From Swiss-Prot:
Protein location: Membrane
Organism: Homo sapiens (Human)
A GO-annotated cellular component: membrane
Keyword annotations from UniProtKB, A to Z: Membrane, Signal, Transmembrane, Transmembrane helix
Protein name: Solute carrier family 66 member 3
InterPro entries: MannP-dilichol_defect-1, PQ-loop_rpt
Signal peptide, first to last residue: 1-19
Transmembrane helix listed as a keyword: yes
Keyword Ribosomal protein found: no
């Protein structure tokens, strides 16, 4: 029973993450605008994903517990390029991508570096959610922000809480997923709220 639940959580998470950012990317491409999206939020999310993936690889955790992160990073990079493209300058993305790539190698130079980065990872990821919330509160417009993407993110956090408890039982990772679940739900509700407000205004 436990093995079946673990398998379901792992594979459903991978399946969801394979398409997680596609609704958001599609919305941006269809609107030909990144209106409502927060660039700081996306950059912080990318940093959080990178640190988390490096930490899992460094400590040799089971690949099925983190295989979605390369997929998520690739989708976030595509979204980042879309934002810069529709804001008028794709070349501005180059320094950000260079920093992310070099960080992958720097993080594993010393054990204390990766441990410190992982301890900060929860704050980085939480900051990314708050940056998106702040953008929504400021504009009072969800724009092209995809509620589906954020609700799917909530699902993956919930499944990763289960898989963490059943495999590594790493408290740092568990705490991160609990906080991310709460914040993802908050962003989803906020997006839906401002979408309803916009529909009523029309």
């Amino acid at each position: 029973m436990e093995a079946a639940l673990l398998g379901l959580c792992n594979w459903s998470t991978l399946g969801v993450c394979a398409a997680l950012k596609l609704p958001q990317i599609s919305a941006v491409l269809a609107a030909r605008s990144a209106r409502g999206l927060s660039l700081p939020s996306l950059l912080l999310e990318l940093a959080g994903f990178l640190v988390f993936l490096r930490y899992q690889c460094y400590y040799g955790y089971p690949p099925l517990t983190y295989l979605e992160y390369p997929i998520l990073i690739a989708q976030d990079v595509i979204l980042l390029l879309c934002i810069f493209h529709f804001n008028g300058n794709v070349k501005q993305a180059t320094p950000y991508i260079a920093v992310l790539v070099s960080s992958w190698f720097i993080l594993a130079l010393q054990k204390w570096i990766i441990d410190l980065a992982m301890n900060l990872c929860t704050f980085i990821s939480a900051a990314s959610k708050f940056a998106q919330l702040q953008c929504l509160w400021k504009t009072r417009d969800s724009g092209t922000v995809s509620a589906l993407t954020w609700s799917l993110s909530s699902y993956t956090c919930a499944t990763r809480i289960i898989t963490t408890l059943m495999t590594t039982n790493d408290f740092t990772i568990l705490l991160r997923f609990v906080i991310m679940l709460a914040l993802n739900i908050w962003v989803t509700v906020t997006v839906l709220r401002y979408r309803k407000t916009a529909i009523k205004a029309e």
